[in-house]
């Protein structure tokens, strides 16, 4: 009984290799189904994202090892001309479990503490469960991984603090204004960065978001997605600057789109009510002199990156706590695996002694009263429990390596002359 894992991720392979190995959901279902239906695996699951494609497999045949699985997925993806075995990592036994726990808890992510990965692992398990390739081992492994992720989220601060520019901008605005639901927001630029910032704002209860963009249809599409349906023509948005408490700029331009003179006029109309300008452009969208104006808080990408660096430093400080949680869960999972491996021997041992007990009691069934027979059954049950206590305890006891399990199982089976067990869980 073994769970092995091979795969490529952001640590082992560049993006052009990861792209060649990635599986769509349809391919994922087909791949794990083929592995199990062919008998190559008794259980199989694949986690496939933009940063990783990882196989988690319970082999069904002796020849199915890490090298075999690497070759199998390379062939499946017809990628022999680009992908080599050295692009993959290998994991075995508890190493496989530790790796999935680290992935699920987001300490193996490209961005430390990035919470999206847990949902992707859950999707991988859902796919395997739907097609019937997640059996007792992968089911227990995945649910333990989900438990690890939950404990990491509730017991540590690993996922706290912004680690993207767009989210850091929104977090900063919330720190300054506290309640964003009462503030009016202008987003200048509806590209990827602007869209992320707007969605983060919306998630923080900012509902009064107005969008302007050179291509108005793009602004309208984002406004509709957010449910604000509020758009300003790009040619005239400067006439309304004084109306906004928060201005986010995220456009591609070589010249400043906002200068000090324009913002000074806007502040006069606002009677110096504070304004935050979050400049997410590169090159910068806003003249740095704007930041010198009274009650004008200007933050550019460098200022936001400083916040991100501090947050990442805080996240890294949480790693010992996270690893302690993983170690704790790994011990429990390893003990469960060991118990599963020795369970057939424990059942056989108990069955043999019960059979001996019943045969001996049968000899006296017609020689003693019903009451005496019950007392004899009770007495022999207690004796058997005490006799079997130590062998069963020894079988269940943790071992240093999985290789030691067969030796102690064989010892017990030989001592008590037990027949060979069913090999399905060995």
UniProtKB/Swiss-Prot annotation:
The active site is at 50 (nucleophile). PANTHER family: GLUTAMYL-TRNA REDUCTASE. It catalyses: (S)-4-amino-5-oxopentanoate + tRNA(Glu) + NADP(+) = L-glutamyl-tRNA(Glu) + NADPH + H(+). NCBIfam families: hemA. The keyword NADP applies. InterPro entries: 4pyrrol_synth_GluRdtase, 4pyrrol_synth_GluRdtase_dimer, 4pyrrol_synth_GluRdtase_N, GluRdtase_CS, GluRdtase_dimer_dom_sf, GluRdtase_N_sf, NAD(P)-bd_dom_sf, Shikm_DH/Glu-tRNA_Rdtase. During catalysis, the active site Cys acts as a nucleophile attacking the alpha-carbonyl group of tRNA-bound glutamate with the formation of a thioester intermediate between enzyme and glutamate, and the concomitant release of tRNA(Glu). The thioester intermediate is finally reduced by direct hydride transfer from NADPH, to form the product GSA. Was shown to bind heme, but the precise role of heme is unclear. HAMAP family: Glu_tRNA_reductase (MF_00087). SUPFAM superfamilies: Glutamyl tRNA-reductase catalytic, N-terminal domain, Glutamyl tRNA-reductase dimerization domain, NAD(P)-binding Rossmann-fold domains. The keyword NADP applies. Its EC number is 1.2.1.70. Possesses an unusual extended V-shaped dimeric structure with each monomer consisting of three distinct domains arranged along a curved 'spinal' alpha-helix. The N-terminal catalytic domain specifically recognizes the glutamate moiety of the substrate. The second domain is the NADPH-binding domain, and the third C-terminal domain is responsible for dimerization. Pfam families: GlutR_dimer (PF00745), GlutR_N (PF05201), Shikimate_DH (PF01488). GO terms for biological process: chlorophyll biosynthetic process; protoporphyrinogen IX biosynthetic process from glutamate. Substrate binds at residues 49-52, 109, 114-116, 120. Belongs to the glutamyl-tRNA reductase family. It is an enzyme of class 1 (oxidoreductase). This is Glutamyl-tRNA reductase. NADP(+) binds at residues 189-194. Keywords: Chlorophyll biosynthesis, NADP, Oxidoreductase, Porphyrin biosynthesis. Catalyzes the NADPH-dependent reduction of glutamyl-tRNA(Glu) to glutamate 1-semialdehyde (GSA). The record marks 99 as: Important for activity. It comes from the Bacteria.
């Amino acid at each position: 009984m073994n769970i092995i894992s091979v795969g490529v991720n952001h640590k082992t392979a560049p993006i052009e290799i990861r792209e060649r190995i990635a599986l769509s959901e349809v391919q994922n279902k087909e791949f794990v189904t083929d592995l199990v239906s062919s008998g190559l695996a008794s259980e199989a699951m694949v986690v496939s994202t933009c940063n990783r494609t990882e196989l988690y497999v319970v082999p069904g045949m002796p020849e199915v090892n890490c090298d075999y699985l690497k070759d199998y997925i390379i062939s499946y993806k017809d990628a022999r001309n680009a992908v080599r075995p050295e692009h993959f990592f290998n994991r075995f036994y508890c190493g496989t479990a530790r790796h999935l726990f680290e992935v699920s808890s987001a300490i193996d992510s490209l961005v430390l503490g990035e919470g999206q990965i847990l949902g992707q692992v859950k999707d991988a398990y859902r796919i395997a469960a739907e097609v019937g390739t997640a059996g007792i081992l992968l089911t227990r492994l995945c649910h333990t991984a989900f438990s690890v992720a939950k404990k990491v989220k509730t017991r540590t601060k690993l996922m706290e603090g912004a680690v993207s520019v767009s989210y850091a901008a929104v977090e900063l605005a919330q720190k300054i204004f506290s309640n964003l639901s009462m503030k009016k927001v202008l987003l200048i630029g509806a590209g990827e960065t602007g869209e992320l910032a707007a969605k983060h704002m919306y998630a923080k209860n900012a509902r009064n978001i107005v969008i302007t963009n050179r291509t108005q249809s793009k602004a309208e599409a984002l406004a509709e997605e957010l449910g604000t349906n509020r758009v300003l023509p790009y040619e005239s948005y400067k006439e309304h600057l004084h109306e906004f408490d928060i201005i986010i700029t995220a456009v591609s331009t070589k010249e400043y789109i906002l200068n000090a003179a324009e913002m000074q006029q806007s502040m006069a109309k606002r009677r110096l009510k504070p304004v935050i300008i979050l400049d997410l452009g590169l090159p910068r969208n806003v003249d740095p002199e704007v930041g010198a104006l009274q009650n004008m808080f200007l933050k550019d990408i460098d200022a936001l990156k400083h916040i991100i660096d501090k947050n990442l430093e805080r996240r890294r400080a949480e790693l010992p706590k996270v690893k302690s949680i993983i170690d704790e869960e790994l011990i429990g999972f390893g003990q469960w695996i060991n118990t599963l491996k020795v369970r057939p021997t424990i059942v056989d041992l108990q069955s043999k002694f019960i059979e001996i007990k019943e045969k001996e009691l049968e000899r006296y069934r017609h020689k003693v009263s019903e009451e005496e027979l019950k007392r004899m059954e009770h007495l022999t049950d207690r004796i058997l429990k005490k006799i079997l206590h130590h062998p069963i305890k020894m079988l269940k006891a943790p071992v240093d390596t999985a290789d030691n399990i067969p030796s102690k199982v064989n010892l017990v089976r030989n001592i008590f002359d037990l027949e060979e067990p069913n090999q399905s869980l060995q």
